[in-house]
Amino acid sequence: MSFEIIAKDLAGRVGKLYTKSGVIETPALFPVVDPRKQELPSAVIERYFGQIITNAYFVYRLTGGRAVDIKKVLSWNAVLMTDSGAYQILRYGSVEVDPDEILQFQARIGSDIGVILDLPFDYEEPYESALLKVEETIRRAKRASAMLDKLEDMLVVGPIQGGLYLDLLATSAREISKLGFHIFAVGSPTTLLEEYRFDLLLEVILHVKANILREAPLHLFGAGHPLVLPFAVALGVDLFDSASYILYARDDRIMLRDRTLRLEDVKTDYLPCSTKLCHKPVKELREMPHEERIQLIAEHNLAILREELLEIKQRIHEGTLWEYLEIKARAHPTLYRFLRSLGRYKRLIEEYDPETHPETHGLFFYQDTAESRPEPHRHWSRTANLYTPSKVAIVIRAGEKPYNKSWEYRYLKSLVGDRAHVLFYDPVFGLVPEEVAEIYPLSQNEAEGESEAARAFAYEWLNNYDVILLYRVDLPMLSKKVIPLRSLDDVLHYI
């Protein structure tokens, strides 16, 4: 197995996952197909996705443990992933199958990617019970690890459990990471997704990501809504699976990129989208037979999910994934709250986020979220130990970019030469020394508002100087000789 990373932004990756039946471009979603009843033909799913997931436990029960060609059963010729029945444990408490047997069964029926049978639990599980289930999952994972070479080239997923207990998540992630699985997965997020607790779910992902092998593919079970996908990808999730497309369709729920509509709530003659479904009059949709409507809405939902993943991939290539998160975060308060809190994980995000992209784009910063982004923190950490060539600082607020091409800077340098160190005051980065002004993205950005953290950094940095001359900048300091300049020519009075 090989996982090749093509492009990065934040902790998100565009990559290629090689399986025995083909290559998956990530981020990728596996639509769930029920082997007991296919409500949407495989040919329809294949128009939008080149991979599916089905429940090996259901197949096991249907055949009495007899191996069948699962791809032939489902009329599917591309990459196929199987789950082991863990979701049924979450819902009903147990399944009647041995963990080792169901893993071997997945290989025998021709699965390209299989999952060990872990013990999932929801986020309300008491700590003592959660600890026991994590320990049992690790024991099962160790047994599965010993079988990896005997599973007919099937890639195997190691789920990481822990609920909202961060110590259990970290322990589980570290232990599972040692066992040689091809893919890791975040377990038991379903309840959080159902309750729109996106902020808690994303925090779980961050803690898992911090404790697994850096380059390993990461799967998120049960996530299939366009709102959560870009955030999960930004934190390092590569693979998803979901039955949301068909579950929503059964209830006449129609996915859009930023929300979900119920058919009964649509007031316009047509839906506000551009898929095949959206060209049908709403009145006609309401009057058609329910089964026919399910198929149409399900196909529409698949199309919307595909659109979302394509947008995410393009954003990663551009290096504008954060800007996309800014847009999506306004769709739900928990997403907005999480985006603002990402500064707590700045070191982790900065570690994964590439400094440059093949095709750089100007970045957009907003006052309420700028402090959470990795770029300002990277600048502050790097300039903290930068040599200061003079004990006299001139701080100017220049409007033209790059800053060291502005007329103010060029005129100032003609007056003082190297007798003072020129710094540019930036509302996001704080102070930008003249010698690094053209480094991306210090001059390649647009900002709205001023970051308090940037101002705090400016005060800290200015402690390196004995005399501070300010031009069009308000930075009062009691402990320093701070002199506001009415014009640039006034600088000659002090140097």
Swiss-Prot record:
Keyword terms, alphabetized: Glycosyltransferase, Metal-binding, Transferase, tRNA processing, Zinc
Keyword Metal-binding belongs to the record: yes
Pfam families: TGT
GO molecular function: pentosyltransferase activity; zinc ion binding
Binding, substrate: 118
Pathway stated in the Swiss-Prot or TrEMBL entry: tRNA modification; archaeosine-tRNA biosynthesis
Domain of life of the source: Archaea
Known cofactor(s): Zn(2+)
Cofactor annotation remark: Binds 1 zinc ion per subunit.
Active site: 83 (nucleophile)
InterPro entries noted in UniProt: ArchSynthase1/Queuine_TRR, TGT-like_sf, TgtA, tRNA_ribo_trans-like
Bilayer-spanning residue ranges: none
Ligand binding (Zn(2+)): 273, 278
GO terms, biological process: tRNA wobble guanine modification
Catalytic activity: guanosine(15) in tRNA + 7-cyano-7-deazaguanine = 7-cyano-7-carbaguanosine(15) in tRNA + guanine
GO cellular component, one term: cytoplasm
EC number: 2.4.2.48
PANTHER family cross-referenced by the UniProt entry: QUEUINE TRNA-RIBOSYLTRANSFERASE
NCBIfam families: arcsn_tRNA_tgt, tgt_general
Family to which the UniProt record says this protein belongs: Belongs to the archaeosine tRNA-ribosyltransferase family.
Function of the protein: Exchanges the guanine residue with 7-cyano-7-deazaguanine (preQ0) at position 15 in the dihydrouridine loop (D-loop) of archaeal tRNAs.
Protein name as catalogued: tRNA-guanine(15) transglycosylase
Organism: Pyrobaculum aerophilum (strain ATCC 51768 / DSM 7523 / JCM 9630 / CIP 104966 / NBRC 100827 / IM2)
Gene name tied to this protein: tgtA
